[in-house]
């Protein structure tokens, strides 16, 4: 899951529009933290992502080793660590709980939509539906529906709070979260190089 993780940051923000709990960037960081760790580990050679060239990658042919960033035991450690960081920065227990929850939610959504993960390493039990490698179109459609549902709920919540979001911001949010996800459909089974010639 890609944009769906960003969408989850809107859940605590709906209850925090006055920034009393934490700044929005803290929720965005928590929602995507595991992927940021993965990218850093791939760049350092600790984890791997193939094919290495972006235009050669499709969801169907993509292979990942995310042992230290996305396997279940490391995720628990990263979630606790980031939650402690949030508690120190925000000095707020609820911010700590939300940050921990967003990290765990990231993993749960990945298990439902993205690649399979293990307890800790490929020699341990695997979890997840692995839709990106088996049924990527279904995975992307589910992610788009998740983005649409969270965003629609968020906009209604803000309106109910008497703080409606402007029309332009609504359009922008739907375009970024839902539109960008739907825009991944051509890459489900074929790499971009197939379409570019």
Outline where the language-model segments fall.
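N-terminal membrane-targeting hydrophobic helices
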Residues: 1-197
């Amino acid at each position: 899951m890609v944009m769906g993780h960003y969408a989850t940051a809107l859940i605590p923000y709906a209850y925090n529009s006055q920034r009393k709990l934490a700044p929005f960037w803290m929720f965005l960081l928590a929602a995507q933290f595991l992927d940021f760790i993965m990218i850093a580990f791939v760049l350092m050679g600790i984890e791997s992502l193939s094919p290495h060239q972006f235009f050669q990658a499709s969801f169907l042919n993509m292979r990942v080793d995310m042992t230290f960033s996305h396997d279940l035991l490391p995720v628990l450690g990263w979630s606790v660590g980031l939650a402690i960081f949030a508690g120190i920065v925000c000095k707020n227990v609820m911010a700590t709980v939300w940050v921990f929850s967003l990290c765990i939610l990231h993993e749960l959504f990945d298990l439902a939509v993205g690649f399979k993960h293990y307890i800790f390493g490929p020699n341990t039990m695997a979890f997840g539906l692995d839709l990106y490698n088996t049924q990527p179109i279904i995975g992307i459609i589910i992610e788009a529906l998740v983005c649409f549902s969270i965003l629609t709920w968020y906009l209604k919540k803000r309106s109910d709070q008497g703080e409606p979001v402007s029309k332009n911001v609504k359009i922008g949010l739907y375009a970024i979260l839902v539109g960008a996800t739907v825009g991944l459909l051509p890459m489900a089974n074929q790499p971009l190089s197939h379409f570019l010639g």
